[in-house]
């Protein structure tokens, strides 16, 4: 129906056609029930709730019209009740933003079972993309529940069990629907990104820490052995355990001003043997060569 209607106003002084400024009617069938519409002083039918407490007009969506204020202020729309909220529930529902308070339009998945507790990261039916695909706005849906399960390791950082194999993908944090500002990086360390070789279980010249693992070279910051040989199918360490001994512990100088006389291992040998069969040392007291 048009926003304004033509009406004839009889007058002893004028019988001309005039256009009045009556607002758009909401009494069309798709809008309000007929029982909630009442004739206005002008010839345009304006949707006016019969009762401001309970009226059929408040149960049906009203297009922008004067009756909208009566709907929103006098009753709770039915779209705000508990239901199996679909992701596009609010956008596809007959309720308009003015008629349906955004707090009522929060889908079920936007309200996590817990709030910030450790149990929030446990296995649940909560989908990772719930907040992203939800019709709730970010201010309406607190993304605490958006933290993936793998973002919370089951062990302490210095624990050896933390380095065991897990199902956590390396791109867990980056592929999470949570934004960087919502997901604390400390909690987003994938368990699988800290392989066994990153926590050596050996000391000194032991080669146990040099075993093969899924650890990327950039993952290990400290290791007692050098990277494995790229030409060996058995993937043995490039160096033997003797090469793994730090130079400082090979020959301890008697004076802090004198350098260590341990020679570097051969860089052309795949077995990485020392240049001499045993690291050469000099006795600072006698000045004679000896063996370590």
From Swiss-Prot:
Pfam family, one: Keratin_B2_2
Assigned GO CC terms: cytosol; keratin filament
Keywords in alphabetical order: Keratin, Repeat
Spans annotated as 25 X 5 AA repeats of C-C-X(3): 26-254
Membrane-spanning intervals of the chain: none
The keyword Repeat appears for this protein: yes
Assembly and binders: Interacts with hair keratins.
PANTHER family xref list: KERATIN ASSOCIATED PROTEIN (PTHR23262), KERATIN-ASSOCIATED PROTEIN 10-9 (PTHR23262:SF170)
Protein's name in the database: Keratin-associated protein 10-9
Species whose genome carries this gene: Homo sapiens (Human)
Gene name of the record: KRTAP10-9
């Amino acid at each position: 129906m048009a926003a304004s209607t033509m009406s004839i106003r009889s007058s002893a002084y004028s019988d001309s056609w005039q256009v009045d400024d009556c607002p758009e009617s909401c009494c069309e069938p798709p809008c309000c029930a007929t029982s909630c519409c009442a004739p206005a002083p002008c010839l345009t039918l304006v949707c006016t709730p019969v009762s401001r407490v309970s009226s059929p007009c408040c149960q049906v969506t009203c297009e922008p019209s004067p009756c909208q204020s009566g709907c929103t202020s006098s009753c709770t729309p039915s779209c705000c009740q508990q239901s199996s909220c679909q992701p596009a529930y609010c956008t596809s529902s007959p309720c308009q933003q003015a008629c349906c308070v955004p707090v009522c339009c929060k889908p079920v998945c936007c309200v996590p079972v817990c709030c910030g507790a450790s149990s929030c990261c446990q296995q649940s039916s909560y989908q990772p993309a719930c907040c992203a695909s939800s019709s709730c706005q970010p201010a309406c849906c607190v993304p605490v529940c958006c933290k993936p399960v793998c973002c919370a390791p089951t062990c302490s950082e210095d624990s050896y069990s933390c380095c065991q194999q897990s199902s956590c993908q390396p791109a867990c944090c980056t592929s999470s629907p949570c934004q960087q500002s919502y997901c604390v990086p400390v909690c987003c360390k994938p368990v699988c990104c800290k392989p066994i070789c990153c926590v050596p279980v050996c000391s000194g010249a032991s080669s146990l820490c040099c075993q093969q693992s899924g650890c990327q070279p950039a993952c290990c910051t400290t290791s007692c052995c050098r990277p494995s040989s790229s030409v060996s199918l058995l993937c043995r360490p490039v160096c033997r355990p003797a090469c793994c001994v730090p130079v400082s512990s090979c020959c301890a100088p008697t004076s802090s001003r004198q350098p260590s006389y341990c020679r570097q291992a051969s860089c052309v040998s795949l077995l990485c043997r020392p240049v001499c069969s045993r690291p050469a040392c000099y006795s600072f007291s006698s000045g004679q060569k000896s063996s370590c």
